[in-house]
Amino acid sequence: MAEVFPFLNGTIHHYQSVTSTQDQIKTLLGDFAPEQGFLCVLADAQQTGRGRHGREWISPVGNLYMTVALRPKGQRQYLGLYAYICGLALYDALKPHITAADIALKWPNDVMVNDQKMAGILMEFHHDTESGEDFLLIGMGVNIISAPEERIALNMVGADAVKPLDIVEAFLGAFEHWQSSYVEQGTADILSTWQGRGWRLDEQVQVKLGSEIIKGRFGGFDEFGSLIILLENGEKRRITAGQLYFGNEKMDG
């Protein structure tokens, strides 16, 4: 059973344990009323948490595991902007607790602290066959009290009293701010702010797209949020998805 309570213009469902928050929230979409701004599932632990590309997300008790469901605003070709909105909101939620360390956003979906990963975001567009509606599902994991090897947690940078719900509520408030900015002012402020918080954007980069490796330098974003890579021959490539590597960073697989 979940503890259910309202927050802002949505509802938070808090569970002790679920298979994954991404799977659990799909069972609740039939009760997601049109007048609600969001639906959120928060769990103390996950049995089968996952990250991007199906990677396992280790999920011990004490860290943050959540998924937010919403009806995305704006035109479909701009839906990729939600990756930046989520990144900015999570940065804003974590920054007050990280006063003696460097925090930055790694494209497309990670929060880095002292050059190590503290948090990750998994976005999924989901069609609910029962209601016929399309939803954006935003899965999120934050290392609060423990982290795998070569990762970092909040308690490793002096933030010992942070509770998962503190971050959830701060994230949802910041998300509403950035989504309103997008709806009212367009994409420019979101993309420029994200770029100002970006991690290692002045370095040589490689993007892995399946079996293809693209090498170049960061060249900004287009209006839809696609990453622009400046190739060595002077051409530009627009990237909407892929794994980004810096310098001699070892590639997965």
Positions of PLM-derived features:
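Long, positively charged amphipathic alpha-helical accessory segments at protein N-termini or as interdomain linkers
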Residues: 8, 14, 74-76, 80, ...
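N-terminal lobe of the biotin/lipoate ligase/transferase fold
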Residues: 1-99, 127, 252-253
